A protein has these predicted regions:
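Nucleotide 5′-phosphate-binding alpha/beta core
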Residues: 1-104, 111-126, 130-141, 150
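Acidic/polar active-site rim loop that often engages polyanionic ligands
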Residues: 106-111, 160-164
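AMP-binding/adenylate-forming
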Residues: 131, 143-168
Length: 168
């Protein structure tokens, strides 16, 4: 099972996302701002259109889709609390439930929080980790210790031999 999980997160799979992340480093501040604004608007519009939770939250706050035109408009959006995420995680989804994987936060600041991830977000996160480590001089295959709070409760630690990584 560990080899399958590793393979699904390996370089050949995440290569397109690595290119996307690397491109961020060559952008000017203005290009980066425009990119971030475009992504914010895409995410907001998807949440408004596809998520029952967000649509209701924004409607009750008097926010229409056309009210959010730029990144500065993020100030208009209601704050979302951990309690809201705990109570409405399924309603927050913008894709069918079968398309996501359940994950949990570590609960470092209190109770663990159930969240959902789709494969593209997992691959994008892997790409960020890959690029960051590579920029700091890390070569894959070198021993690595990863301190993360998302191990199964039965595991105190996990050694992934394919990546030479020890997870705590």
């Amino acid at each position: 099972m560990e080899s399958c999980k590793y393979m699904l997160r390996s370089y050949p799979i995440i290569r397109p996302y690595i290119k996307e992340v690397n491109a961020l480093f060559s952008m000017s501040p203005e290009e980066l701002r425009k990119r971030n604004e475009r992504r914010f608007l895409e995410i907001f519009q998807r949440a408004y259109d596809k998520s029952p939770f967000y649509h209701k939250l924004y409607t009750e706050a008097g926010i229409k889709k056309e009210d959010i035109k730029c990144l500065d408009d993020i100030k208009k959006l209601p704050v979302i609390t951990k309690d809201m995420v705990r109570s409405h995680a399924d309603e927050m989804l913008t894709v069918p439930r079968w398309k996501v994987i359940v994950a949990n936060t570590s609960g470092t600041t209190g109770t663990p929080l159930r969240v959902y991830e789709d494969w593209s977000s997992i691959w994008r996160n892997q790409a960020y980790a890959y690029v960051t480590r590579k920029r700091e001089g890390f070569t894959y295959g070198q021993p690595l210790v990863s301190l993360r709070g998302n191990l199964d409760k039965r595991d105190m630690m996990l050694k992934v031999h394919a990546s030479n990584t020890l997870f705590f």
